Swiss-Prot record:
Pfam families: CASP_dom (PF04535). The keyword DNA repair does not apply. It comes from Sorghum bicolor. Residues 59-84, 140-170 are extracellular. Keywords: Cell membrane, Glycoprotein, Membrane, Transmembrane, Transmembrane helix. InterPro entries: CASP/CASPL (IPR006459), CASP_dom (IPR006702), CASPL (IPR044173). It is found in: Cell membrane. Homodimer and heterodimers. This is CASP-like protein 1D1.
């Protein structure tokens, strides 16, 4: 009987050990992982919200002299919606801001429990998608901002930031925040992809 009890206890211990999650899998379920994910998504929300507010308020009107008529000044406005690239950046920041809010709520729910593998995989795909959107929008808007700052002598495009200083500061700040948002999305992708990698081991 003692032998049977020992064997039964041994088998029960093996079954419990097999049922227990492996250390790599458990590492992805701790609150530290979900906490880091939530913090990055909250930061992404703040950055994209600030970026779209700064860009939406990018407008300035200045009085420009007419060379043909000395003493005559003409009011010329500069707004973000005068450039398709800046409109694209505003839309990208808007949808990314909404996405970060939704995924932050999802991450908040996962703090108290484990994160399903399917959820992590979906987050990786979506983070990659939005990182690509933000990177492309930031790149196109950055090109427009650079031309406004430096001009282009080959195409005779004159710089305007020496005239529309406040407008260009808004554009530059929004482009910088778009770059920060892209980096945050890359970090989120790495974080969730690493967790999936740990679970597969």
């Amino acid at each position: 009987m003692a032998t049977v009890d020992v064997d039964t206890t041994t088998e029960s211990g093996k079954a419990a050990a097999a049922a227990a999650p492996s250390p790599p899998a458990a590492a992805c379920r701790r609150s530290s992982f979900s906490g880091a994910d939530l913090a990055l998504r909250a930061l992404l929300f703040a950055v994209t919200l600030a970026g779209l507010i700064v860009l939406a308020t990018a407008k300035q009107t200045v009085s420009i002299p007419v060379p043909e008529i000395p003493g005559l000044l003409v009011s010329r406005p500069a707004k973000f919606n005068h450039s398709p690239a800046l409109i694209y950046l505003l839309v990208a920041q808007c949808v990314t801001c909404f996405y970060s809010l939704l995924t932050a709520l999802t991450s908040l729910k996962l703090i108290s429990g484990s994160s399903p593998t399917k959820t992590l995989f979906l987050l990786v795909l979506l983070d990659v998608l939005y990182a690509a959107i933000m990177a492309s929008a930031t790149g196109s808007a950055g090109g427009v901002a650079w031309i406004g700052l430096k001009g282009n002598t080959h195409t005779n495009w004159t710089k305007i930031c020496n005239i529309y200083g406040n407008f260009c500061r808004h554009i530059g700040s929004s482009v910088f925040l778009g770059l920060v948002a892209s980096v945050i999305l890359v970090l989120l992708t790495i974080l969730n992809a690493y967790c999936l990698y740990r679970r597969s081991r």
